[in-house]
């Protein structure tokens, strides 16, 4: 290759440009290869993360929001299975009580429940949360509660209440809950002289990774969480607290309205298992600090997009637009049929 460059031109400037292009190409190829190797190691070679470092089986507590169903319920169940006591936070108290009884019976850990409708953003609810965890050695917080649009919708047609709820639930409540719980985590870690670490997981989305037309408010709310979580990670890591944004594509859940799992769409159990296995590892989010895309199919999708068209490209935006316009069209037709019936 060097001989070829020398033979192309005797002009020093041209040679310098060609050598520079060659070095840049080698650098890009090397970083791509190393990132791909790291992704594979994270997924299939490195052992699962040992939650003893977060206080599992040592009397420590995890707080999980949106804990009564789906992904949140799986976080609660799987963290309890690892030996963490759990504080279950969600809107419906009856579901929380039933889950708490199931967890205590099956995993022999302690539980607390708190009925908390985050869409109301009531100060009394945050005070109740603070009171619930006041005497608990909390080491883990899972910010799982979230809301999307009922169906894809142009921003200019978005219902004001839906817009407000998305921002309140995904952003305001997440930040305020973290302000309540994170100081307890920092205190617990400090009291043990950092022999136990803290962990804050916040649910992100491909909607935040890729600007998504027809889900503009939801997409923006999740993109906000990316920057906020990364900034918080920088602040709390020196204090012994790991902060990660968890990126996912679709998972079978009430919010996604998908009932049947597939290779690219896991059920909550498989998804949460991948999250907890890979805490502290980027997996598909190789280009991002304090971020993980842990489920294998989502990881390769994330890695592929970043290393091909790019997350902010016109191509990615147009593909997303077409997909969500189609989803909206089908949803409206289905609603029209149901109305006739």
Swiss-Prot record:
Residues involved in NADP(+) binding: 63, 117, 144, 218, 222, 251, 253
Record's keyword annotation contains Ubl conjugation: no
Entry EC no(s): 1.1.1.330
Top EC class for this record: oxidoreductase
InterPro entries the record matches: 3_ketoreductase_fungal, NAD(P)-bd_dom_sf, Sc_DH/Rdtase_CS, SDR_fam
Top-rank taxon, per record: Eukaryota
Pfam family for this entry, one: adh_short
Keyword Transferase on entry: no
Membrane-topology descriptor: Single-pass membrane protein
Gene3D superfamilies with a match to the protein in the record: NAD(P)-binding Rossmann-like Domain (3.40.50.720)
Record-linked SUPFAM superfamilies: NAD(P)-binding Rossmann-fold domains
Subcellular location: Endoplasmic reticulum membrane
Segments traversing the membrane: 17-37
Keywords: Endoplasmic reticulum, Fatty acid biosynthesis, Fatty acid metabolism, Lipid biosynthesis, Lipid metabolism, Membrane, NADP, Oxidoreductase, Transmembrane, Transmembrane helix
Main localization of the protein described in the UniProt heading: endoplasmic reticulum
Pathway: Lipid metabolism; fatty acid biosynthesis
Family affiliation: Belongs to the short-chain dehydrogenases/reductases (SDR) family.
Function: Component of the microsomal membrane bound fatty acid elongation system, which produces the 26-carbon very long-chain fatty acids (VLCFA) from palmitate. Catalyzes the reduction of the 3-ketoacyl-CoA intermediate that is formed in each cycle of fatty acid elongation. VLCFAs serve as precursors for ceramide and sphingolipids.
PANTHER family reported for this sequence: HYDROXYSTEROID DEHYDROGENASE-LIKE PROTEIN 1, VERY-LONG-CHAIN 3-OXOOACYL-COA REDUCTASE
Listed HAMAP family: 3_ketoreductase (MF_03107)
Protein name (database record): Very-long-chain 3-oxoacyl-CoA reductase
Source organism (scientific name): Meyerozyma guilliermondii (strain ATCC 6260 / CBS 566 / DSM 6381 / JCM 1539 / NBRC 10279 / NRRL Y-324)
């Amino acid at each position: 290759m060097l001989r070829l460059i020398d033979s192309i031109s005797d002009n020093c400037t041209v040679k310098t440009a060609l050598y520079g292009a060659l070095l840049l190409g080698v650098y890009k190829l090397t970083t791509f290869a190393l990132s791909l190797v790291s992704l594979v190691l994270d997924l299939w070679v490195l052992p699962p993360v040992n939650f003893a470092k977060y206080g599992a089986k040592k009397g420590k507590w995890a707080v999980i929001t949106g804990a009564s169903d789906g992904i949140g319920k799986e976080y609660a169940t799987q963290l309890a299975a690892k030996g963490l006591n759990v504080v279950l936070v969600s809107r419906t108290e009856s579901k929380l009580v039933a889950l708490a009884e199931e967890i205590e019976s099956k995993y022999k850990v302690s539980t607390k429940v708190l009925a908390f409708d985050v869409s109301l953003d009531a100060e009394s609810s945050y005070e109740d949360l603070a009171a619930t965890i006041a005497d608990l050695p909390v080491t883990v917080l899972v910010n799982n509660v979230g809301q999307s649009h009922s169906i894809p919708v142009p921003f200019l047609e978005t219902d004001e209440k839906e817009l407000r709820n998305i921002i309140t639930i995904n952003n305001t409540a997440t930040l305020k809950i973290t302000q309540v719980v994170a100081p307890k985590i920092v205190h617990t870690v400090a009291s043990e002289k950092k022999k136990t670490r803290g962990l804050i997981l916040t649910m992100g989305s491909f909607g935040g990774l890729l600007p998504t037309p027809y889900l503009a408010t939801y997409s923006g709310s999740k993109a906000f969480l990316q920057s906020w979580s990364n900034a918080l990670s920088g602040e709390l890591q020196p204090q012994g607290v790991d902060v990660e944004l968890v990126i996912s594509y679709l998972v079978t859940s009430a919010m996604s309205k998908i009932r049947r799992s597939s290779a690219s769409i896991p059920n909550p159990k498989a998804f949460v298992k991948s999250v907890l296995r890979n805490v502290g590892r980027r997996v598909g989010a190789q280009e991002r600090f304090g971020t993980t895309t842990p489920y294998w199919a989502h990881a390769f999708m994330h890695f592929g997009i970043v290393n091909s068209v790019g997350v902010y490209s016109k191509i990615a935006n147009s593909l997303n637009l077409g997909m969500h316009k189609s989803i909206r069209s089908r949803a409206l037709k289905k609603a029209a049929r149901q109305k006739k019936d």
